[in-house]
Amino acid sequence: MTPLVLIPGMMCDWRLFAPQLEALGRRPVLLAAPTKHDTMEGLAAAILAFAPPRFALAGLSMGGIVAMEMLHQAPERIERLALLDTNPRAEAPEVQARRIPQIEKAMSGRLRAVLRDEMKPNYLANGPDRQRILDLCMEMAIVLGPEVFARQSRALAGRHDRQAALAAYRGPALVLMGVEDRLCPRDRHELMHSLMPQSRFVVVEDAGHLPTLEQPDAVTRELLAWLEQPAT
């Protein structure tokens, strides 16, 4: 059974995938922590260093960006690829510019304010679990702390466009997004699907940027189906 490497998004940990982990049964799963480097290249290389020789790879948001960098660095090791609520392009200059004051604010002891006012409110669709998920996101972020926030922010700001890596990939692929994702909108996912025409493109209703938590059953079904596809 092919091992699965899961990469969470910015300022998230294994709990981002907690509902899916329960459904994966006896499949070997490695939960990556992209927290120790401030470049996308460094984050990807660190995960590749401990990953199995060949594996299935899934990442959400920043985790998807790290996954695409891993695909660029070691395409022969990735048996199948799932990209959730993410973006293959380099960071836009206007977003880069916003990161500097966010880092300064977080490092001055105001990480909670950065997350509350500038980031997390845009993550989720409206729904009965919205506040519970927001609280979980805040808890994960506070545990990781401002230094991780700064490193991840710098890695995102300096990342490269990885469309060419996707276009060259031929393995089973899943592109999935929440219909109300405002951070990584639909056109980014349609682009990834067009670059990997063999991929399945799924839009999850009643979900925003974190469908693994907002609509866990729907996401779990799609991930299990992706894992069961024949390898090429």
Predicted region positions:
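Gly/Ala-rich beta-loop-alpha elbow adjacent to hydrolase catalytic centers
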Residues: G59-G63, A67
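Short alpha-helix in the alpha/beta-hydrolase fold that links the catalytic acid
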Residues: G171, P185-S194
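Catalytic histidine neighborhood in serine/cysteine hydrolases
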Residues: E190-H209
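Conserved HGGG/HGGXW glycine-rich cap/lid loop of the alpha/beta-hydrolase fold
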Residues: M1-A46, L60
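Flexible "cap/lid" loop of the alpha/beta hydrolase fold
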Residues: H72-Q73, R77-D117
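Conserved alpha/beta-hydrolase catalytic His-Asp/Glu region
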Residues: E91-E94, R110-A168
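Short beta-strand/loop motif that positions the catalytic acidic residue
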Residues: Y169, V175-M177, D181
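Catalytic histidine-centered segment of alpha/beta-hydrolase-like enzymes
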Residues: A207-T220
